[in-house]
């Protein structure tokens, strides 16, 4: 008759207990003890909502397309419907100058300070640090929709004082997007927040700082 292991005999620590103990000791490194918050925000278009399963929910949404292709207007349409929920605030990071007061008014955005805030900064660290602070220190249980317009215009603080050639990066916007997702995506989706990242799909990516990259869908 084969000899029973300690686990089979009911002795020792089970894997379930080990995992639970580890999670208890490292609460700051995971979201297992937090209840996921789920909802759907309509685009305002029936056809688009059907294609998207009703709209968008918590997590990171990436909207890419041509310059002047309506990406900002689409984001504002989602923002208007997001504001209809209780304790729902839109934080718009204006990293380039496309958004105007007329666009905000035309989209029907509620500009109450607890519903809408525009942050004019293209510094990557400023954007991600403010988002982290709002998500991690949320005693009033707000739901946030962060709109970054656009990822291509964000610049790391260390690059601001460099010359144009020294600071040049191949596909810099994509690199920042990847770093952002690693740091923020899981926390946003678990805690019920949306980050709407606007960017352009580029062709002719080159290490030559004098060669123009073309927007392309």
Name the predicted role of every residue range.
Residues 170-217:
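Phosphate-binding/switch region of NTP-binding enzymes
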Residues 114-124, 159-176, 209-215:
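Flexible beta-alpha connector loops of hexameric P-loop NTPases
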Residues 128-140, 163, 211-215:
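Conserved RecA-like ASCE ATPase "motif II neighborhood" in helicase/translocase motors
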